[in-house]
Regions:
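Acidic, His/Gly-enriched loop-helix segments that form or flank divalent-metal centers
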Residues: 1-103, 107-113, 119-120
């Protein structure tokens, strides 16, 4: 965004280095807890069955809201392969849980509440 273009010299170089480094971070995180296997992704897991390290469309992981729209229109289908799936990206008034899917973005970036979930 504009914030990066407005940085100068060493600050911009450092920001660019951190951005490049962030490209090596995982797109999907799996955590085994007492409550089972928890999968965390930004917006969606683009499959009806989770498999660790399964190749998936990264753009869908980051941006896709189709599953949430389907859930909210009454098509309640969870994802097989793990006990819980945690998503953000789409600000909602309150946390939304359906089947084994949990949407916890409550718009903190826009002045809404910050929702946290303790997995263990």
């Amino acid at each position: 965004g504009n914030w990066l273009a407005q940085l100068k010299g060493e600050q911009q170089a450092q920001a660019l280095a951190l951005l490049r480094r962030s490209e090596t971070l995982p797109w999907i995180i799996e955590i085994a807890c007492a409550n089972g296997v928890n999968v965390i992704a930004h917006a969606n897991y683009p499959s009806s069955h989770y498999v660790r390290d399964k190749p998936v469309n990264k753009q869908s992981v980051l941006w896709d809201r189709a599953r949430l729209r389907e859930l909210m229109s009454g098509n309640e289908a969870g994802i097989a392969g793990a006990d819980h799936f945690w998503f953000g990206h789409t600000p909602l008034k309150t946390r939304y849980d359906c089947q084994n899917l949990h949407y916890i973005d409550t718009g903190a970036v826009f002045g809404g509440a910050l929702t946290l979930a303790q997995l263990q």
